[in-house]
Amino acid sequence: MNPNQKIITIGSASLGILILNVILHVVSIIVTVLVLNNNGTGLNCNGTIIREYNETVRVERVIQWYNTNTIEYIERPSNEYYMNNTEPLCEAQGFAPFSKDNGIRIGSRGHVFVIREPFVSCSPSECRTFFLTQGSLLNDKHSNGTVKDRSPYRTLMSVKIGQSPNVYQARFESVAWSATACHDGKKWMTVGVTGPDNQAVAVVNYGGVPVDIINSWAGDILRTQESSCTCIKGDCYWVMTDGPANRQAKYRIFKAKDGRIIGQTDISFNGGHIEECSCYPNEGKVECVCRDNWTGTNRPILVISPDLSYTVGYLCAGIPTDTPRGEDSQFTGSCTSPLGNKGYGVKGFGFRQGTDVWAGRTISRTSRSGFEIIKIRNGWTQNSKDQIRRQVIIDNPNWSGYSGSFTLPVELTKKGCLVPCFWVEMIRGKPEETTIWTSSSSIVMCGVDHKIASWSWHDGAILPFDIDKM
């Protein structure tokens, strides 16, 4: 092929490619016009995605038109079913660590709330740590004087379990200096008590919205559990106290559905005292282990049926589990009457396991330090001293505090029984330490079918903080 023929051949090929390119562009333009004139019913690339924006989950439908995205927000459907919670408690051989927030250690340099009374409650999809803030941060001037229980600055807030009570992840729940919270399978219900001592009010929120209220009926510091309430088949139960902390007070059981109170009953308990009950579901009933702040070093027991009938008495075991208390050897136990003359007390818990009982208590008999959980054979029904298992959670030189119960629902565990769990508060600062503030962190344990070794999961913060040295 001579040079002229080569030039003609290359030119013809180039012209052919050019013509093909023009044809393709014309076809592309025609198709685009036809599709855009088809009102969104033509070719597209659609999909539904889930995105997280700073702790908030949004479900979005993304429609893509070549280089253009249309994002349509889809309302998240609420959970459709109430939790059953009529299953029995699982048998626990020991308790394994579930979470530890280390809030005070982190708070020495992080934006962490000053808190007290932390507790845990679970929905079908997650567990959350609730806590009562003091409207102030650790290592800040507003933390001064936060040893006080009741103030207009206290609020109930929550984080996902294991997170510290920090300002970036905490969710506001209620204005409160006493509270309880639980999930019925559809939405969270919170009960927050606030206001003056003689006219306090409890506001019942459901799904974050105020739905009902309870006014003080005795005019003497209306208060509630400081731990999880209990929902069974959509009905939620909790216990409240109104009256003196050191003599006879008045006690009531409340029942709500969708946050609206549908029943209540007074508890007749002459000579006994009930405060800060730690409750859990078990075989269709609500079982509570409470605090006697009047005289008893044994703990009140309250069992609530769905119709609000109840039985009330004391933990039968011949081993005391309140603080302060006397020697184990000098305690006889009673199923019906308070025993001891130590007064005061601390919030605690227990779990019935058939006729046995797992019961938590401080290791110290006189102060809120150390923590252990012991299993007492036949301790739910008899004055038994037969301690068949012991597990140390916090060793004695380290501070503890309140403790309480909750359960893992079957929706979370896929078991046929409710896993018993508990949390232990570790109080730091005033009145035991040289600081201007009082706050706490917590350790959470859940029942397993294996024995777990004792250890000390104590708070570990080094005090005082910088603010305490000014």
From Swiss-Prot:
Localization per record: Virion membrane; Host apical cell membrane
Chain positions covered by the region annotation Hypervariable stalk region: 32-86
Task: List the Gene3D superfamilies hit by this protein, alphabetically.
Answer: 2.120.10.10
Q: How is its activity regulated?
A: Inhibited by the neuraminidase inhibitors zanamivir (Relenza) and oseltamivir (Tamiflu). These drugs interfere with the release of progeny virus from infected cells and are effective against all influenza strains. Resistance to neuraminidase inhibitors is quite rare.
- Which class of enzymes does this protein belong to? hydrolase
Active site (record annotation): 149 (proton donor/acceptor), 402 (nucleophile)
Task: Give the Intravirion membrane side ranges.
Answer: 1-14
Give the record's membrane topology.
Answer: Single-pass type II membrane protein
Any one Gene Ontology cellular component term annotated for this protein: host cell plasma membrane
Residues crossing the lipid bilayer are 15-35
Which InterPro entries does the entry mention? Glyco_hydro_34, Sialidase_sf
Family as reported in the entry's similarity comment: Belongs to the glycosyl hydrolase 34 family.
Q: What information about domains appears in the record's comments?
A: Intact N-terminus is essential for virion morphogenesis. Possesses two apical sorting signals, one in the ectodomain, which is likely to be a glycan, and the other in the transmembrane domain. The transmembrane domain also plays a role in lipid raft association.
- What does the annotation say about its assembly with partners? Homotetramer.
Q: What does this protein do?
A: Catalyzes the removal of terminal sialic acid residues from viral and cellular glycoconjugates. Cleaves off the terminal sialic acids on the glycosylated HA during virus budding to facilitate virus release. Additionally helps virus spread through the circulation by further removing sialic acids from the cell surface. These cleavages prevent self-aggregation and ensure the efficient spread of the progeny virus from cell to cell. Otherwise, infection would be limited to one round of replication.
Further details from the record: The influenza A genome consist of 8 RNA segments. Genetic variation of hemagglutinin and/or neuraminidase genes results in the emergence of new influenza strains. The mechanism of variation can be the result of point mutations or the result of genetic reassortment between segments of two different strains.
Name of protein? Neuraminidase
